[in-house]
Amino acid sequence: MAAESTVELESSMKEHRDDDEKSNGFSVSAVSMDVEGGDKDPSGNGVSSVIPGWFSEISPMWPGEAHSLKIEKILFQGKSEYQKVMVFQSSTYGKVLVLDGVIQLTERDECAYQEMITHLPLCSIPNPKKVLVIGGGDGGVLREVARHSSIEKIDICEIDNMVVEVSKQFFPEVAVGFNDPRVTLRIGDGVAFLKAAPEGTYDAVIVDSSDPIGPAQELFEKPFFQSVARALRPGGVMCTQAESIWLHMDIIEDIVSNCRHIFKGSVNYAWTTVPTYPSGMIGFMLCSTEGPLVDFKHPVNPIDQKDCQKSVRPLKFYNSEIHTAAFCLPSFAKRKIGSKET
């Protein structure tokens, strides 16, 4: 007999449901799905109709490939003003957050992404105080930024409120970052927010975006990087998600080229392993503005050695050795982008 899974939102989300629908343009409803029976998914959220009970991630950004996880239970499906949102319980990676058919995080390996995109930039400068996060609606980057005791202010601008609410509901250990009193959440367009930010406001800007399609496309374009550079203090740093060297070398080359023209300090590409991302890895572009020299490859603010780690969730992935190793590129990538770094 086919097993059914029914989505029921907790009362905390139900209380805000009507207001959220009016102000953010999304609707949330209970969903039933015949997981074991392998029903086709007309909404395009990526549930495979070829292998019953499996989620398959298929995208034109990685043609000829499919990445699959076995589904135990569909926990949530909804559609916001911007994208389709799904959460399911997998057999081997815990709960999984999916946006427009693309895996954003799993409970098992989210640490490899969240810790690296945060600590690569913040451990490269002394005493960061003001940080802006663009995207990052799951709260994981906030959780990691909050480890740094020097931080006084954390702004986050996320375009999709459904991502925030769903993350708080289903991924509380990730979304715990929203509970930090230094955090100010703004629901809105990150591009517009940056344009309005006073010049030289931030020590670091972390861009936790999805792939350069849909609502995140602007976050990979030259005008956006110009806004980031303007919002940073002299010697300030940016770290942005920068795709996979196995799949998107053309995109990476464009990002490196744009950043070299805009940021007058250091420009480096780093990477980390994330098993549930296409090709099993993801890259980061790290840039600094003109001012005090930033050597991204050698951390000056080693968070893994500080006493504050005794009182919070231990680091699972990041350490100072991995920090330095993250900038080592395989030969084919070094030939393509290594010479373009500064």
Swiss-Prot record:
Q: Where is the composition biased (Basic and acidic residues)?
A: 11-23
Return the EC number: 2.5.1.16
Stretches of the chain forming a coiled coil according to its record: none
Q: List the InterPro entries.
A: PABS, PABS_CS, SAM-dependent_MTases_sf, Spermi_synthase, Spermi_synthase_euk, Spermidine_synt_N, Spermidine_synt_N_sf
Residues annotated to bind S-adenosyl 3-(methylsulfanyl)propylamine: 83, 114, 138, 158, 189-190, 208
Which catalytic reaction applies to this protein? Answer: S-adenosyl 3-(methylsulfanyl)propylamine + putrescine = S-methyl-5'-thioadenosine + spermidine + H(+)
One GO biological process term: spermidine biosynthetic process
**EC category:** transferase
By sequence similarity, the record places it as follows:
Belongs to the spermidine/spermine synthase family.
This chain's protein is named: Spermidine synthase 2
Origin species: Pisum sativum
Gene that this polypeptide is encoded by: SPDSYN2
